[in-house]
């Protein structure tokens, strides 16, 4: 779990909460604000992640005040979650999330407008694309590992071809 930002204002947001499932590598990119409180993080988590995955056994986060507050410690204790903030000035502890942050930046760089104030509208698509890529560690996409099938994207090639040359070319 990591906060990415501050970014240029986009629909009232200036930060992205990035959450990565360490088993399936499924990632969530949630627009928020740099002043979000730990209660706000907990609410985002409840509304967008808990409803799909339940309560995690362990959370690795950076040293942000939102993640190491008394509230978060109490929340983790009540829910029996092992909190594991990364070592200060040692982001490699949560290297997987740091890598995902880089991918989000690369994706947004390709799609945002020149004023960079529309990045929040691209987050859902960035999340979908990221979760549809095959991960080198699992040899499957996070989407497939979570749902057991590959998503339809509306641009799938036909599986049966009537023209023999096309059939030969696709095989």
Question: Which functions belong to the PLM regions below?
Answer:
Residues 6-8, 48, 119:
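Residues embedded in well-ordered secondary-structure elements
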Residues 26, 38, 42, 46, ...:
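Domain-scale segment recognizer with a strong primary affinity
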Residues 52:
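Phosphate/ATP-binding catalytic cores across multiple sugar-kinase/actin-like superfamilies
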